[in-house]
Amino acid sequence: FFYGDWAKVDANTYALVYWDYGNGGYLTTFDINDDASTISTKKSRHRFTQSTSTNDGRFSDILELGSNMFVVAYEDNSNRGIIKTFTISDDGSTVTEKDFEYLISSSSNSYMEWNSMVKVDNNTVAIAHSGAVNAAEGWITTFNVDPSTGVISGASGSSNKYVNRLKHDNVLGKYNSLVKLGGDKYVLAYSGSGEDGFITSFTISDDG
């Protein structure tokens, strides 16, 4: 069990994504009662990766977009960054895949690691990740998700699946934690040069 991340589905249902080393990436849903004394599994080990290859599913992160639509980011066995969308029923018993895209490139070793996503507006997502050169460098990348269909898209008229990209650190961008402060203001905590900790703030427009 590595890279676990939670999202809330409804008042007492939660989704957990994680990487099972050598077996792929999985999504499991749980019901947790009001006083947290009872935890019951609703959907067990739904595999969200394309394969069960050794490294498929690393750096998994899940985000609730709204109206039962969820976004999962991860890296596959060929070191490619992948975005997938799913619907999850309110009771957590049904998980349905909607779309799958290589965010940066379908070429091997394009890298998208240490992922942390936030919702920008109802159809735009920002992700902090490392990438490009041997999984180094710190990046912020934005992309669109149709909230009703789950279709992932980039800037209008572009073949890319991302809207925009910003390299904020030329050396390193690991252990990312990206949060929205409010309005168009965002703050990122991450590990950079020398494994030192850094905090950087950004503005991101609603359209990414």
What annotation goes with each model-predicted range?
Residues 1-208:
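Extracellular, repeat-based ectodomains that mediate carbohydrate processing or recognition
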